[in-house]
């Protein structure tokens, strides 16, 4: 019977001595002599390893020099329970085959390797235990997000990656150019910065929809928080207010994080250890703490009371909160998750619903301790003329977005939604401080690997 290491650990209570199993994986370590050899194996299904025990007869059949770190092997043998040992079981090998040898210049070695170096080899870094844990958590979070929306009757829609418009109106789009005289699409085309506008179209027919897709920003930023290509989760709900929007965002985050912790205990244990056992308490506190809703103008007032703490001390109504401000609000003022609502319209996107004061818009940024902004959302502007006027104020061309404007003419119901940067969520759950370490192949300004 072929088994993964994850399956063996899951079924530990039901395992019996001398059961026969077949396993595949990569060598983590190999030690021993001519009489007995211990080979540690990992197959990528878990951060936990399996110890293979080779006795004299099997050792003679293989070249032990080829059992080096990273070598791909197949093994068959009987499982022996070892409850008193460090590992709960081991596989006594009756057959071993080296499927793929490793050159001596394999970049990953037993000694600790820096994250900076591992970023130079994104095609190999997942073969370290740290990145194995990160990517397993990432995959589980993605699964749980789909599960959450399915259980809440949302329809998953596929939005285009190539688009004719800048959905955020910020001019940070990447142009698709085939270098021909005539545009391939007979007009300029861009890599999408958001799927929200297309999601709005489908919400006006399916009521509750969501997208989970790559998005692109031509931001020339070289920070630990920015990527040129990243994944976004963007639900859109017809007949929904800002209050409904915040409620579903809060529920989604807490459900997804809770379920991921439960399903990935070994990976979370490793990551918690690397954060001095502070990661799991932080996440569990978030899961159980009620979200606070705070008006932007109140947040600015509270920041003014503590402005001496900040590098950016020029705090005023109309400013876009910096990362240090967001973290301070969630960590020191609220001491938990907080939704900042009603930002000034001049620092937010054109499609947000304009409040009666004509100065602010019905939107929210959800902030969490340790990372700051995790989600941004809003109630959408449902009034055709208001939307046209706002686009004109921002010099956003109307023609490419006429289809979006026309939605307001054809049975449009008040709509709300939000965007969650998936990599920001992975950072929060894993405790990893650099966004380039939570995506398999990071794309940033100035360089592209693979």
Swiss-Prot record:
Give GO cellular component annotations, separated by semicolons.
cytoplasm
Q: Where is the signal peptide?
A: none
Cellular location(s):
Cytoplasm
Q: Enumerate the Pfam families for this protein.
A: tRNA-synt_2, tRNA_anti-codon
GO MF annotations for this entry?
Answer: asparagine-tRNA ligase activity; ATP binding; nucleic acid binding
| Top EC group | ligase
Report if keyword Ligase is assigned. Answer: yes
Q: Which UniProt keywords apply?
A: Aminoacyl-tRNA synthetase, ATP-binding, Cytoplasm, Ligase, Nucleotide-binding, Protein biosynthesis
Identify its protein family.
Belongs to the class-II aminoacyl-tRNA synthetase family.
Concerning NCBIfam families, the annotation shows:
asnS, PRK03932.1
Query: What is the name of the protein in this document?
Result: Asparagine--tRNA ligase
Q: Which organism is it from?
A: Metamycoplasma arthritidis (strain 158L3-1) (Mycoplasma arthritidis)
Quote the gene name from the UniProt entry: asnS
